[in-house]
C-alpha cells in the first residue's frame, strides 16, 4: 500500500521521465539478446531471511529485507522480459536462486534451460519430505 501511495504522489513530469528511461533500458536489454539466448542472474543477494527477521545484510550492514530483496529482480522486470526464477539445489541454507531471462516470446528457452539445470542437479529444491518422491 505504501508503494502505491508513493507512486500516486509522483509528479507527471517524473512519470514521463521514468517511461523514457524504461524505453531506453528496454532497448539496451533487448540488444543483449542479439548475442545470447538466455541471461542468468542471481535472484537475491543473500539467503532468504526468516519470517520474523525484517533485515538482511547488504554490504556488511543490516538493511530492510523488504526494501532490498528485490534489487536483482526489479530491474529485469522493468523492460517487460520473461523471467523464470528457480532455486539452487543443496545450498545448505535457506533458498538461494537464479533468474533466467529471455527475450519476449522466448519463454521456451527459459523452461528448457531450467529443466537442464534441474536434471544436472544444479537447480530444483524440494521440501525434505518430498525428496524421495522426486
Briefly describe each language-model feature range.
Residues 1-78, 128-133:
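Serine-dependent amide/ester hydrolase catalytic core
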Amino acid at each position: 500500500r505504501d508503494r502505491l501511495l508513493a507512486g500516486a504522489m509522483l509528479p507527471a513530469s517524473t512519470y514521463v521521465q521514468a517511461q523514457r528511461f524504461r524505453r531506453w533500458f528496454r532497448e539496451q536489454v533487448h540488444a543483449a539478446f542479439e548475442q545470447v539466448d538466455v541471461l542468468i542472474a542471481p535472484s537475491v543477494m543473500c539467503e532468504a531471511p526468516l519470517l520474523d527477521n525484517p533485515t538482511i545484510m547488504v554490504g556488511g550492514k543490516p538493511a530492510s529485507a523488504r526494501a532490498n530483496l528485490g534489487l536483482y529482480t526489479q530491474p529485469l522486470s522493468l523492460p517487460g522480459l520473461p523471467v523464470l526464477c528457480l532455486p539452487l539445489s543443496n545450498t545448505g541454507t535457506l533458498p538461494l536462486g537464479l533468474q533466467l531471462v529471455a527475450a519476449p516470446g522466448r519463454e521456451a528457452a527459459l523452461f528448457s534451460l531450467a529443466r537442464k539445470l534441474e536434471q544436472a542437479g544444479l537447480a530444483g529444491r524440494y521440501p525434505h519430505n518430498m525428496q524421495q518422491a522426486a
